[in-house]
């Protein structure tokens, strides 16, 4: 079937099971071929082909609402709703988004990117439906990994309490990105082996209703028998106890079983949870055999061999530099522990996990718990290293404020994927952390200019004993600089001069330092002398350096790959104002006040005007022509 000709899912209504099976093969082949060129979330989507087709066949989108938790498994949904022809632009600048996007299609009713949000949003939609007295199904699709998130459990509790009509699809592939952890995962494991609980339960209830009601004792005994048999028949009744009708487990690749169960769910009042078992990566052997999450999201790859197409790496990944330095220090300090909220592979903690399994803690998709747990460990003299993506640190903000900073606890937060991350887009850009951490009392915030300074700042963080400390580091690779063999602590709150200059100064840090250095060299050739400063401590700033620089009364330009509002540049302006430098000319470059969508980092930097050319032009406008050297 030519998938690019699909306009909407209505064509599925008249298709037979054999035709649907052929469509499944076509979709898998299409995904494998297209994503081999663009990259993307291949394994999650190969696992939900039949489930997605079944949902679109039995329900009527967009009247009926599908909410894809996390959203990375929505590619099949996009194909069935008329977007197959756009897959060549997947996750590229101004191309097809890798997550549901309301402006893309009326079938995308809820935008996602972070996990565990679908149930709360679905509850909101269902309550709105009931208040408006309309009739449509609300169907969140959530994975077993996302179900470990506290927000999802809060929503389950509320939905069950209110007895709201809703069909929750639990897509259980036994993995989120890496293998799942936690007691709830173990409950689901028991449910997988318990058989078709709901059919047996119905027969049981029918039989028990036939027992003659000869007095209250017999009736009470019958109810006790029913409850006892319910616990005997299935080793976990977690969802039933929350108020849901539990249906399953059902084979998520068997159309007959899917149709049977979903039709039953449609007729059932109140909240229903359909437990669907799927195989992540189904139909592509390299993805099927992946047990650590390598094929969850990929770049381009060779279909035949399953080898990834990677540019030749001349420098280590930032995540590896940080995690391997932590590992090196952990070998001589038993107090060091590593903590991750379900991202051991992305944060490059596999080596730490292998060498120190008892000191490597993966809490699952539970950022709030991970953060406060780290705080608890710090109270007992441990040295917790919390490795967390910038975008996911947003989810634990209250814990950072209330539990870490307020108590001034020694927690080292490794803020991975800081700055623009590219193809994953606006839900994953790490551009807000400076603004939401800089104003917190007791917090120290750093970002290195290269991987050598990075390892020294990791050492600095592990030696620091006066409170919380955080290190920002980017996605991707370092610069390939020579690494010192001996680690050293860098004095807190100190900056360094990278290039001397007399007519203007650029203050920056991290990934924008090469841009600043190149701009300064070009300006030098044009007769403009510009100082470049490595402001590696975003907080506390180097106040002595700032006093000296502001005293020279030369134009200052701050550059940051982070949001301008509340950012580093704002801090410099505040310092100048509070210290009486009212005539100082300070301008800022950074991320504007909007969400930055998907695309390559290079393209996104061009789009927002954060380039070497833009820096050169800005400095020229800040320096009067008569002050420029001939």
Curated annotation (Swiss-Prot):
GO molecular function, a single term: magnesium ion binding
GO BP annotations, alphabetical order: 1-deoxy-D-xylulose 5-phosphate biosynthetic process; isopentenyl diphosphate biosynthetic process, methylerythritol 4-phosphate pathway; terpenoid biosynthetic process; thiamine biosynthetic process
Annotated positions binding Mg(2+): 144, 173
Cofactor descriptive note: Binds 1 Mg(2+) ion per subunit. Binds 1 thiamine pyrophosphate per subunit.
Top-level taxon of the source organism: Bacteria
Gene Ontology CC entries for this record: cytosol
Pathway, per record: Metabolic intermediate biosynthesis; 1-deoxy-D-xylulose 5-phosphate biosynthesis; 1-deoxy-D-xylulose 5-phosphate from D-glyceraldehyde 3-phosphate and pyruvate: step 1/1
Keywords: Isoprene biosynthesis, Magnesium, Metal-binding, Thiamine biosynthesis, Thiamine pyrophosphate, Transferase
Residues that hold thiamine diphosphate according to the record: 72, 113-115, 145-146, 173, 284, 367
Catalysed reactions, as listed in the record: D-glyceraldehyde 3-phosphate + pyruvate + H(+) = 1-deoxy-D-xylulose 5-phosphate + CO2
Cofactor(s) needed for function: Mg(2+); thiamine diphosphate
CDD domains assigned to the protein according to its UniProt record, in alphabetical order: TPP_DXS (cd02007), TPP_PYR_DXS_TK_like (cd07033)
Keyword Cell cycle attached: no
Reported function: Catalyzes the acyloin condensation reaction between C atoms 2 and 3 of pyruvate and glyceraldehyde 3-phosphate to yield 1-deoxy-D-xylulose-5-phosphate (DXP).
HAMAP family documented for this protein: DXP_synth
Subunit structure: Homodimer.
Stored NCBIfam families: dxs, PRK05444.2-2
Protein name: 1-deoxy-D-xylulose-5-phosphate synthase
Organism: Bacillus mycoides (strain KBAB4)
Gene name of this polypeptide: dxs
